Amino acid sequence: MKFSILPMIASAMAVSISYDPIYAADLSMGSVACSNGDHGLMAQYPTLGEVPGFPNVGGIPDIAGWDSPSCGTCWKVTIPNGNSIFIRGVDSGRGGFNVNPTAFTKLVGSTEAGRVDNVNYVQVDLSNCINGAN
């Protein structure tokens, strides 16, 4: 029997989640890694606020740079206390999650912490991000 550990590796890695006010509704999609190209989102959504799932958007670990195949994907992010949220990837997270402040507040309770470490994450169906599951 053959098992693949690749899906488990992503969620087992220790990453952090932080927030950045740059991920505002009026931010041009031309400013993020998922702007244009084959996997770009700008043609459909000129501003970040138009992306279904906003404000639960931001940089994710699986987007390394421009035109990543992970652009627009949905991720369930769980912090150590068990709280979780769905985040739609629109930018590079540079090894972690960096999200809209409102999404961070939904997850953590406030922006006071600034960052939470030891975050688990797993890719989920896009419907979790666009159907108001948060």
From Swiss-Prot:
Cystine pairs: 34-71, 74-129
Biotechnology: Generated Asn-98 mutant protein displays improved cellulose weakening activity, thus making it a potential candidate in the production of biofuel as an enhancer of enzymatic hydrolysis of cellulosic materials.
GO BP: modulation of process of another organism
GO molecular function: chitin binding; toxin activity
A cellular-component GO term for this protein: ascospore wall
Family listed: Belongs to the cerato-platanin family.
Functional note: Phytotoxin which causes production of phytoalexin in platanus acerifolia, platanus occidentalis and platanus orientalis. Induces cell necrosis in tobacco leaves, and in callus cells and leaves of P.acerifolia. Induces reactive oxygen species (ROS) synthesis, nitric oxide (NO) production and mitogen-activated protein kinases (MAPKs) phosphorylation in the leaves of A.thaliana and P.acerifolia.
Official protein name in the record: Cerato-platanin
Species this chain originates from: Ceratocystis fimbriata f. sp. platani
Gene label: cp
